[in-house]
Amino acid sequence: MVRLTTELFAERPQFVNSVNMREINLRGQKIPVIENMGVTRDQFDVIDLTDNDIRKLDNFPTFSRLNTLYLHNNRINYIAPDIATKLPNLKTLALTNNNICELGDIEPLAECKKLEYVTFIGNPITHKDNYRMYMIYKLPTVRVIDFNRVRLTEREAAKKMFKGKSGKKARDAIQKSVHTEDPSEIEPNENSSGGGARLTDEDREKIKEAIKNAKSLSEVNYLQSILASGKVPEKGWNRQMDQNGADGEAMES
């Protein structure tokens, strides 16, 4: 078990990434708990905690600068109620391959008024009835969900499904649902992120190079998530970003 200590923060790579954001790389350290983040003094736009053993998305100090969190391949099944207060400018939350199980588990994100991009690919929540519709209804500022742009017709359908008296029963049932299973008992599901061939070493190197040359945050997010999933999307990893609506317009204001 590796603790998030002052020494670890100092040792890990810190750099300005391809889209001119200051980033710290905390990947692959077997970190179980988010802690001691205050020592970074809110100096980063991006914190990358991919490939760790984190179970709870909590314990952040107030960070006004941080806007992007990469948490691919962890065991997260809990999002703290105060996340919006602690991270008021959070724009991108990437949670590919975690253990978010119930629609009710995303309730804290509804208070994140600047959240525009989320991915829950590889989480049990994606198999829930009306998953995408509820995400659209509950997170009105989000413009891209799982690399698919939210369309106006979807927003209207989501409102019709969940708004007002007719949607109250469905809302109440969802808001009462929270995940209670101990994530330590859950083994990662190799098929949870969908079909597709496994990435080859050559694919991985090409994707890493593409990340370095990315022109937008949405492109970085898309490529990072493919690396995290370890699989080639059906349309290929190097497809144009606007095919699924994850283009710069969808992400950047």
From Swiss-Prot:
SUPFAM superfamilies: L domain-like (SSF52058)
Localization of this protein: Nucleus
Region (Disordered): 163-205, 232-253
Coiled-coil spans in chain: none
GO molecular function: U2 snRNA binding
Listed GO CC annotations: nucleoplasm; nucleus; U2 snRNP
Biological process per Gene Ontology, one example term: mRNA 3'-splice site recognition
Family per similarity comment: Belongs to the U2 small nuclear ribonucleoprotein A family.
SUBUNIT field: Interacts with rnp-3.
This protein's name: Probable U2 small nuclear ribonucleoprotein A'
